[in-house]
Amino acid sequence: MANQTKRILLVSTDRAFVQETRTAFAASESIQLVTVEKNITDLRGEIQETDCGAVIVDMDAANLDQIEALQRITRRLEGRAPIVVVTQEFNAAAVRILVQLQVADFLVKPLTTADLVRSCIRALQGPGREENTESHIYTFIPSAGG
């Protein structure tokens, strides 16, 4: 247990978003933020080479090329690192695709850094926590009779 530092890789071309995210994670001693200031479609192995605990991808979820690039990344990672997607696009088709790709979470801009940090921490905790947040459906049947 000498080194408990988790690396989070941020892929974004939005300089303001990158700076805000760096500032948000700077206070944490257990999380190291590594940034790649490229478009998701321009990545050529940066994520594969980086040993990361989670990946934050800032992308346009309505852009088919970027969705295909995200699909390649999810296949490359093979579930070893959760992916958190940050997008400005929020429509049913984009949500359906992100759910099918099994991203850990997706957030819509504008967002607060607190939401992003919370989402990343939840993603780093892994799937073992999902059982605690699973929804439960209760059905109440009224008594019928006379």
Predicted regions and their residues:
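Walker A (P-loop) phosphate-binding motif
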Residues: 130-146
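A short, hydrophobic beta-strand element within the central beta-sheet of small alpha/beta folds
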Residues: 80-90
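C-terminal output helix
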Residues: 111-119
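Short hydrophobic/Thr-rich beta-strand motif most characteristic of the beta2 strand and flanking loop
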Residues: 30-39
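Conserved phosphotransfer microenvironments
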Residues: 53-73
